[in-house]
Amino acid sequence: MPACAWARRGIMEPINFGSKGGFVDQHAQPVLSLLVPIYNVERYLRQCLDSAAAQTLENIEIICINDGSTDSSPAIIREYMERDARFVMIDKANSGYGDSMNRGLDQARGEYVGILESDDFMAPDALEKLVHVARTHDAQIVKGNFDLYWSTPEERRELFEMFSPSRCDKVVRPAADAFAFHQKPSIWSAVYRRDFLEDGDIRFLPTPGAAFQDASFTFKAFALADRAVWIHDSILSYRQDNEGSSVNASNKVFCVNDEYAEIERWLSCEYAERCGEEEAARLARICQAVKYDSYMWSYVRLAPQFRVMFLERMASEFKAALDDHTFELADLKPWKRANLESILKDPAAWAQANEHYATAGKFGRAMHYLKLGGPGLLLAYAKSRSDHE
């Protein structure tokens, strides 16, 4: 592509010579396009891009989508472009995560698409493993486990095991049961066949300013995939100590609500037309149960001044779902059902009681985790204390 054409599309012109050994044919299809959305992450960006450059699967393109960063992130990206011809940059004004990812999908040329968040870093053989499994099983999605990673106060990591060995290394249809939908979306621990994404029109919701927009993408991909494979390997290190991870801006409070509104719209329209109304209704009930988990996770991340208003919106949505019979309280486990019933009755009172538990010593914190995440989260809390005492 001529340099002027790259400039018109807001993309930095790629360098033809890089550290991976000579001339890179800009017209040959790469095996995989790795999308790296970037916004003001200079502190972690080099570790992220180093892990991309070091992949044992070398025939890849690394598309860095700079979402109007005001720090040194663009300069860091250019450093990598000068050293390695596989790096390109989409340089644009700030428009949010979803729009950035859609721009990356539009630019991608690979047979497969992978995603790497700019504060995380991949295992060196991650992409090679994922693509090998995808080709071996003719899979549309291959997804692995990942490590939770802390760099301070001392470096440590813990395996986040979504897929036990008994679920791995076999072809599944994710929509056949609810299991896959209830796992953390983690779009970045997977690869997707690009023609599968294009055929299903699986894209991101381009909400301006939103930071976390993976729920609708994941749900659509799982709903449409006929062939998916889970692997037990840890694919990357998912950073837990990024100070910018909580929601402190009022315009981002309801981004997760927008994601689930899009899923509900899509199920009732495109998916129902494609797969039938009965199948769409079945997945709609799964969606509501998954939405509860996602909303409770989002609640914890909100700044305190936004929590009651978020719960009020949550209560309104679930009341509407109960009224139109797209959801039944029986779809939730008993402790989740009791929790939601309290929120539906009085969101502000639930929030006040929850904050009391959270600040009431060891027992109060235990009750706080039990209310938010049930026995599983309580056990995880207890384990984390025993590991560090």
Kindly label every feature range from the protein language model.
Residues 30-33, 61, 216:
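Cell-envelope/extracellular polymer assembly enzymes that use nucleotide-activated donors
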Residues 66-75, 95, 117:
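A conserved acidic beta->alpha catalytic loop
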Residues 4-53:
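N-proximal low-complexity "stem/linker" segments adjacent to membrane-targeting elements
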Residues 19-21, 139, 163, 300-389:
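Membrane-interface aromatic/basic loop that binds lipid-linked glycans or pyrophosphate carriers
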Residues 74-109:
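Conserved donor nucleotide-binding strand/loop of the catalytic core
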Residues 97, 101, 118-232, 236-253:
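Donor-binding/catalytic cores of nucleotide-activated saccharide
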Residues 233-242, 247-274, 292-325:
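Catalytic core of nucleotide-sugar-dependent glycosyltransferases
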Residues 113:
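Short aromatic/hydrophobic "clamp" motif used to bind/position activated sugar donors
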